[in-house]
Design a protein with these regions (language model features):
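A short, basic N-terminal segment
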Residues: 1-90, 251-264
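Walker B catalytic acidic pair
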Residues: 177-178
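Metal- and O2-centered redox machinery and metal/ROS homeostasis
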Residues: 22-25, 93, 107, 241, ...
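Walker A/P-loop nucleotide-binding motif
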Residues: 108-127
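Pre-Walker A (pre-P-loop) alpha-helix and adjacent loop at the N terminus of AAA/AAA+ ATPase modules
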Residues: 72-73, 79, 85-113
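Residue-level preference for the first positions of well-ordered beta-strands
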Residues: 110-114, 140-141, 172, 204
């Protein structure tokens, strides 16, 4: 049954009332010895204004979220990497969820993650889920890779120091696909500078890579690679995202480590 719309009406004092809620839309006030009729909000108008304010707040929140994602997630495919889109095939997603749930402690304790495993194991997806969840909470996150960073640094009139500073300013930096970037002396120096700058500022870092833990710890590496990987392993807890890990004992130990950090 449709609600009938009742016309506004005047009371015995000549003040207007809302025909729907019955509350005053006008009231009399005395000022400087004179009586004035002034407007006021009835319940319907208060409710309508509140709903409009809430709508505007939601729209502004969506606008700000879009802006944060546009800056922090340059590749549009990252936008769809969300926990609600997970197919449940890899239980390591629980670590990503716990990381987000305990983000305040993770940030305070400077806890990062090193998500490792072959192509197709979901490590980049897990990192993207963390990024999107924190962005939706209002946090500033940058998810990128060193190939993109190095391209920016070698572009015309690029300010390398400013680019590094911009990356350091993010509460969380996610580096996707570590190891695919070029291995020139310049490139390795800049990779180290970015990582070390966040280390010095005690800001968390999440890294995804196809490299194995043994590769990153190998003493056969040159000095440039050794110091990069050593710094990452200082900052990040290794999590193997593949199936059965050949380094099962070490993986279990690290899993306990990150869980203890997450739970306090």
């Amino acid at each position: 049954m449709e609600n009938k719309v009742t016309a506004d009406y005047l009371d015995e004092e000549g003040c207007l009332h809302c025909g729907t809620c019955g509350k005053r839309k006008q009231m009399k006030v005395s000022l400087m010895g004179f009586e004035h009729v002034v407007s006021c909000l009835c319940e319907c108008e208060v409710k309508a204004r509140q709903e409009l304010d809430e709508k505007m707040q939601r729209e502004e929140a969506q606008r700000q979220l879009y802006q944060r994602k546009s800056v922090g997630l340059r590749e549009r495919r990252f936008w769809e990497w969300k926990f609600e889109n997970d197919n449940g095939s890899n239980q390591k997603i629980l670590i990503a969820r716990q990381y987000v749930e305990n983000w305040t402690d993770m940030k305070r304790k400077n806890v990062g993650l090193l998500l490792m495993g072959p192509v197709g194991t979901g490590k980049s997806f897990f990192a993207g889920c963390i990024a999107n969840a924190l962005l939706e909470q209002g946090e500033r996150v940058m998810m990128t890779n060193f190939s993109r960073i190095l391209n920016e640094m070698t572009s015309y009139q690029a300010d390398k120091n400013q680019i590094i500073q911009n990356l350091v300013d993010y509460p969380l930096l996610i580096i996707d696909d570590l190891g695919i970037e070029r291995n020139s002396e310049f490139a390795l120096e800049q990779v180290y500078n970015v990582i070390d700058s966040r280390y010095c500022k005690m800001l968390p870092l999440i890294v995804t890579t196809n490299l194995g833990l043994n590769e990153m710890k190998s003493t056969d590496l040159d000095t440039a690679h050794q110091r990069i990987y050593s710094r990452i392993l200082e900052m990040c807890v290794p999590i193997y995202c593949g199936g059965e890990d050949k380094r099962k004992e070490e993986g279990t130990e690290k899993l306990v480590q990150v869980q203890s950090l997450i739970t306090g």
